[in-house]
């Protein structure tokens, strides 16, 4: 593989660059994400029992749902999902951070995890992927196989609406929380549909990829920040929109990271086969390559892309190496990080600005803090809560 070293680019060691040092899809948590035991306690005490009890009169249903939740969650690294907690704890007034509201914050984090998992369960069926995170996909091990897994995945995405009704219906921001989750569900399915249709075209383009990424990942990831801001008591639509814009870009970076790992990491390293290679997916890597390839490289690429033949997959990887894909990836991430930094500086809210800046620093610049970055957010964060 081509080395990431490039004299013209700064040394970056954030979460989306971990694969260069570890050669695999492993994410180190944000340095302030230290209370995951409390989060998982809420999952065990509240989320799993609530979801099981929706149809407790149906024989074997509660047991199936419990197994589904424990087997599939989290579908991706739960480090991505710290957005909701970071924003709430940093932005909400100390008086708002009661035990009840902290629990609700964890329920919002769980809401995002459930939506992520819905995406993964259905995506694995669509991609015909047998594995996720190094173990068999839910559709491979559940009773009923793909036929029932489809409905399991659909339920997973609807459980958040039930949780919101159970715990937020008397909150002033309830209707906005509900609307955000519904629109996230809709936009995600739009993005997934566009993504699958692109596999039939087998002609990856950046214009197509931007549409996929916006709906499938950008708006999806941004929903976590929107839910957290609303729960924190911010009612300014301008502030909410500006926050969503920043985290939409962050979500697009994360999706590009995932696309890049399909090229850069082996199936043993990232826990599943390279579905994008085999399905001719319109990913950032394939779309960027088509922008950069010479005519002869493009022809050779199209002859090999979308095949499970190992020699053809190797040819595609070699073509990516020829155009120095790691450098192109780094340039893309840095460009979008700079966009976010500009938007963050324009945020007219000090604590929200600190939360956004801290997340982007962790995502792109460094996985461990310098003294200044740790101190600034710690001043805003209710560390003892």
Curated annotation (Swiss-Prot):
Annotated domain remarks: The Asp-Asp-Xaa-Xaa-Asp/Glu (DDXXD/E) motif is important for the catalytic activity, presumably through binding to Mg(2+).
Chain ranges for the short sequence motif DDXXD motif as given in the UniProt record: 123-127
Tissue distribution: Specifically expressed in tissues lining the cuticle of the abdominal sternites of mature males.
Matching Gene3D superfamilies: Farnesyl Diphosphate Synthase (1.10.600.10)
Higher taxonomy: Eukaryota, Metazoa, Ecdysozoa, Arthropoda, Hexapoda
CDD domains in alphabetical order: Trans_IPPS (cd00867)
Protein source organism: Murgantia histrionica
Residues binding Mg(2+) 1, per UniProt: 123, 127
Reactions catalysed, as given in the entry: (2E,6E)-farnesyl diphosphate + H2O = (1S,6S,7R)-sesquipiperitol + diphosphate
Any one biological process term the GO annotation gives: pheromone biosynthetic process
Cofactor(s) listed: Mg(2+)
The keyword Translocase belongs to this UniProt entry's keyword annotation: no
Segments crossing the lipid bilayer: none
Keywords for the protein's UniProt record, in alphabetical order: Isoprene biosynthesis, Magnesium, Metal-binding, Transferase
Keyword Transferase: yes
Enzyme class per UniProt: transferase
Name of protein: Sesquiterpene alcohol synthase
Entry note: cofactor: Binds 2 Mg(2+) ions per subunit.
Family: Belongs to the terpene synthase family.
InterPro entries, per database record: FPS1-like, Isoprenoid_synthase_dom_sf, Polyprenyl_synt
Record GO cellular component, one term: cytoplasm
């Amino acid at each position: 593989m081509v080395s990431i070293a490039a004299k013209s680019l700064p040394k970056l060691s954030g979460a989306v660059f971990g694969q260069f040092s570890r050669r695999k899809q492993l994410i180190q948590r944000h340095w302030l994400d230290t209370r995951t035991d409390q989060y998982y306690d809420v999952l065990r005490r509240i989320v799993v029992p609530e979801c099981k009890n929706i149809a407790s009169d149906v024989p074997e249903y509660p047991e199936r749902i419990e197994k589904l939740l424990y087997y599939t969650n989290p579908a991706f690294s739960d480090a991505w999902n710290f957005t909701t907690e970071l924003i709430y704890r940093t932005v909400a007034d100390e008086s708002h951070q009661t035990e009840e509201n902290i629990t609700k914050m964890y329920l919002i984090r769980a809401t995002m995890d459930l939506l992520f998992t819905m995406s993964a369960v259905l995506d694995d069926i669509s991609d015909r992927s047998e594995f996720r995170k190094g173990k068999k996909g839910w559709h491979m091990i559940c009773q009923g196989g793909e036929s029932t897994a489809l409905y399991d995945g659909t339920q997973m995405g609807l459980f958040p609406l039930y949780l919101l009704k159970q715990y937020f219906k008397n909150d002033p921001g309830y209707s906005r929380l509900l609307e955000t989750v519904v629109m996230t569900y809709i936009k995600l399915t739009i993005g997934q549909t566009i993504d699958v249709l692109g596999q039939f075209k087998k002609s990856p383009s950046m214009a197509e990829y931007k549409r996929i990424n916006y709906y499938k990942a950008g708006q999806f990831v941004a929903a976590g920040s929107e839910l957290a801001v609303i729960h924190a008591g911010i009612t300014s639509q301008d502030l909410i929109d500006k926050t969503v814009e920043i985290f939409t870009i962050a979500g697009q970076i994360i999706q590009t990271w995932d696309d890049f790992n399909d090229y850069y990491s082996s199936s043993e390293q990232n826990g599943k086969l390279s579905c994008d290679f085999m399905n001719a997916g319109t990913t950032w890597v394939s779309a960027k390559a088509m922008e950069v390839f010479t005519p002869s490289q493009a022809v050779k690429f199209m002859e090999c892309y979308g095949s499970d033949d190992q020699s053809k997959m190797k040819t595609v990887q070699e073509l990516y190496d020829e155009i120095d894909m790691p450098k192109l990836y780094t340039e893309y991430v840095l460009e979008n990080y700079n966009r976010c930094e500009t938007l963050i500086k324009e945020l007219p809210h000090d604590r929200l600005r600190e939360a956004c800046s801290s997340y982007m620093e962790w995502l792109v610049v460094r996985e461990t803090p310098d003294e200044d970055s740790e101190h600034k957010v710690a001043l805003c964060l209710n560390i003892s809560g």
